[in-house]
Amino acid sequence: MIEIDKFVSRHIGPRNEDIGEMLKLINCSSLDELIEKTVPNHIIFKDKLKFRPGMSEEFNKINTQLLSLKNNFKKTYIGMGYYNTITPSVILRNILENPGWYTAYTPYQPEVSQGRLEMLMNFQQMIIDLTGMDIANASLLDESTAAAEAMMMAFKIKKSAKFTFCVQNKCHPQTLSVLKTRAKPLGIKIIFDNPDDDTFGCLIQNPDTYGEIANLNDLININKSHDALSIIAADIMSLVVMKSPRDFG
């Protein structure tokens, strides 16, 4: 019997005699026979794989660079919140490539590094500075998920009989899809552009999916007239040069 409570047995694997006992138990004479009985014959690749001769790391690097020259570089016009960005080398070297962010470990929580915690805190502070919010979390999965969570927060904050959520017509389609998925089981109705008295919250995309900048003052005042909370789906980079959502009230 293998002693599974010991490190060696758990992590190094079975010995040859152990393999023999296991094969005997399932009536197989070898591992090859086990594979033949397990994997359907029509998908087993019996020929030898054709590999190129081995090469040194330096030669492989040069060869990869030469292959990359055959790529066709095209401009992307996808939009919809996905924009090319440039990371300055000083940030790349001192932040993304700095091992100090991911090697200093926290004694009380060994699975999370102190550097990562500090980076998340800096991220949250940056979001607070750019948006004008009092607090900020450490990010969600993506913008669509964040919009859905914001809708749910507005729904719970209002604690009323309102079940309508208004979305700006030029919202990113991927965001709208997630909103609809989250709203349906809760009985929340999604409407576009024009909130009514049954609206508890309204999502405004700024800049919108076409890159246009909205007049938030007018939109927020309309929402207030219906006692609806305003949620701004903002491009963080744009807030460097634009008013923060808080400045619009």
Q: Each predicted region: which residue ranges?
A:
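N-terminal entrance/gating region of PLP-dependent enzymes' catalytic architecture
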Residues: P14, K37-N122, I128
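Charged, compositionally biased N-terminal leader segments and the immediate start
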Residues: M1-P14, D18, M22
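Short loop-beta-helix segment that forms the pyridoxal 5′-phosphate
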Residues: Y108-V112, D129-A148
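Structural signal for hydrophobic packing residues in well-ordered secondary-structure cores
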Residues: S30, H42, T64-N72, Q124, ...
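Hydrophobic alpha-helical scaffolding
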Residues: S9-I12, K24, K50-G54, P110-S113, ...
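Conserved PLP-enzyme active-site core in the AAT-like
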Residues: T145-G249
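Gly-rich Lys/Arg/Thr-decorated short loops/hinges at beta-loop-alpha junctions or inter-strand turns
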Residues: I2, N98-P110, I128-M133, K159-F163, ...
